[in-house]
C-alpha cells in the first residue's frame, strides 16, 4: 500500500476523533490544555491499536463485530451527547471536569471502524505496522488540533456551545449506525 493511501485512510479514520475533540474542546479553558494532549494521545493510541486487533482477529470476529459495533458506537455516542446537551442547557455553568472513563468510551467508540480496516488489511495481506503508525500519528495530530480549535471557539461563544458538541456526537453516532447497518 502506498503512503498516500495510508494517509487518506488515516485522515478518514481520524475525522470522528477530530470532531469529538472540537466538541470537547468547546468546554476547555486555557488551564486545561493537558486534556487536549491526553485526549489526542488516547484517540491516537486507540486508532492505532484497533487496526492491529482487527488484523490479528481476521474474519471470524469480523462477522460478530460488524453486526454489533455500529450499534455500540451509536449508543455510546448518543449517551455522551445527550449528557453534554443536558449539562449545557439545564445545569449552571460549571468548570469542565476531565473524565478518563468518558475519554476511554469516546476513544473506543471512534476507533471501532479502525478495527474493520485492520481486518481488511489482513484479508488483503497488507503489512500492518506502517499504516498503524500513520493512522495513529494523524489521529493524534488532528485530535490535538481539534481540541485547540474547540477551546478557541468556545471562548468566543461561551460554554453554551457544549450543546452543539453533544449534538455533533449524536450525529457522528447516527452516521456510524447508518453507514454500517442495513435496515431492510
UniProtKB/Swiss-Prot annotation:
Q: Name one GO molecular function term.
A: manganese ion transmembrane transporter activity
Q: How does it sit in the membrane?
A: Multi-pass membrane protein
Entry GO CC: plasma membrane
Major subcellular location class: membrane
Query: Is the keyword Oxidoreductase assigned to this protein?
Result: no
Q: Which domain of life is it from?
A: Archaea
- What keyword terms does UniProt attach to this protein? Cell membrane, Ion transport, Manganese, Membrane, Transmembrane, Transmembrane helix, Transport
Report the transmembrane regions from the record. Answer: 3-23, 36-56, 65-85, 103-123, 126-146, 163-183
Subcellular compartments: Cell membrane
User: Transport: is it a keyword of this entry?
Assistant: yes
Which cysteines pair up through disulfides? They are none
| Pfam families tied to this protein | Mntp (PF02659)
Q: Which family does it belong to?
A: Belongs to the MntP (TC 9.B.29) family.
Q: Which PANTHER family match?
A: MANGANESE EFFLUX PUMP MNTP-RELATED
User: Main role?
Assistant: Probably functions as a manganese efflux pump.
- The name this protein goes by in its record: Putative manganese efflux pump MntP
Q: Which gene encodes it?
A: mntP
